[in-house]
Amino acid sequence: GSELGKLHKIAAPKYLQNHANFGKQEFSNVKKYAPNSLFDSWLSQNLEYIQPFISSKLPQGLIHADVFSSNVIINKLQDSAVIMDFEEAVKYYRVYDIGMTIIGICGEGVTINFEKVSALLKGYQKELQLLDIEINALQAFTVYAGSAMTFWRHSHFNFIKPDPDFFDHYKSLQTLTDFVKQQPADCFVKLAR
């Protein structure tokens, strides 16, 4: 968490785009290859869920946008971490990056390890204090991040580079995202305070 907080303190280079690569502005592309499908409906419902939490008042900055265990190196003592592979980096909402990290690091199968989430948020807030607007949007942005990664897997393996072995690869992330969405409204707020 503290490494993510340190990253978010770095000024975003001007050349970075200001939206997530597979964010909400791309979700409508599902209509090109799977219109009126169950996945199209799922993605639309999640977009409707997150939309009220998207605000120009949410802080933006340099974000990694893909903090999964494959992009983090932890030393042998497990007291230091390095975030690597910045190919998805953009200037976007900090809380989106926190949500993506919850999906990518704190996800365990089809559930979230809330002890890991708590540790992540504590570490983050040693570097940057979350604003109330970010705390209140955290669950929705975790759903947003999960939806974006699920969309990437679905579109990549079913449309962009179809691969029958991976047609259903998105489903575990979809289930994890649904788990986050089904938590009580104050669950993430309590973890962040």
Regions found by a protein language model. Give the residues of each.
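A cross-family kinase active-site recognition segment
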Residues: 1-38, 60, 170
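Active-site activation/catalytic loop segments of kinase-like enzymes and analogous catalytic loops
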Residues: 95-129, 145-161
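ATP/Mg2+ or Mg2+-diphosphate-binding catalytic cores
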Residues: 149-193
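Active-site acidic catalytic loop and adjacent metal/ATP-binding pocket
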Residues: 48-96
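Short, mixed-charge aromatic SLiMs
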Residues: 26-34, 121-130, 167-185
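Short acidic/histidine-centered micro-motifs embedded in hydrophobic/aromatic stretches
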Residues: 45-46, 141
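All-alpha amphipathic helical-bundle segments outside canonical DNA-binding/catalytic cores
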Residues: 130-142
